[in-house]
C-alpha cells in the first residue's frame, strides 16, 4: 500500500478554467470517476487528479484511495460538479478530472490559490 501523497484544497481562478479547457482540447485530460480509476490502473497514469468540492463522499473516498495507492496527488478544488461538467463535457455533472501531462499539471496547480 502506498503512503499518502497529497490531498489539499484549493480555490480556482478564471485562468484555471482557461488552462483546463486548453488541456482538454489538447487531449491531456480524463474526466469522470470511472474513467480516471481505469486510467490509474493503466500503464500511462495521471499526473494529478482534481476533485470538485461537492463530489459525493463515496466518489471522494474512491478517488482518495486509488490516488493514494498509485501515488498520484489529489487536489480538491472550489469548482462545483456543474462547472466542471459544463467545461469538460458540455453539460451534466463531472466530479473529477485527471491531468495526464506534467506541464499542464504544473500550470494548473500554479493557477490555484
Region spans (language model):
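Short, compositionally biased "basic patch" segments
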Residues: 1-17
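Long, amphipathic alpha-helical "stalk/connector" segments that mediate intersubunit docking
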Residues: 2-7, 27, 100, 108-110
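Electropositive phosphate-/nucleotide-binding environments in soluble metabolic enzymes
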Residues: 10, 30, 102
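Positively charged, polar, low-complexity stretches
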Residues: 25-27, 33-38, 58-86
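Short connector loops at helix/strand junctions that flank enzyme active sites
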Residues: 44-45, 67-69, 91-92
Amino acid at each position: 500500500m502506498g503512503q499518502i501523497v497529497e490531498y489539499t484544497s484549493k480555490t480556482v481562478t478564471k485562468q484555471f478554467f482557461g488552462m483546463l479547457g486548453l488541456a482538454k482540447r489538447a487531449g491531456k485530460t480524463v474526466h469522470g470517476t470511472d474513467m480516471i480509476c481505469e486510467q490509474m490502473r493503466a500503464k500511462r497514469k495521471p499526473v494529478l487528479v482534481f476533485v470538485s468540492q461537492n463530489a459525493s463522499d463515496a466518489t471522494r473516498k474512491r478517488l482518495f484511495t486509488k490516488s493514494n495507492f498509485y501515488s498520484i496527488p489529489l487536489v480538491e478544488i472550489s469548482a462545483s460538479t456543474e462547472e466542471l461538467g459544463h467545461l469538460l463535457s458540455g453539460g451534466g455533472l463531472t466530479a473529477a478530472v485527471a491531468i495526464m501531462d506534467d506541464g499542464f499539471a504544473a500550470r494548473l496547480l500554479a493557477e490555484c490559490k
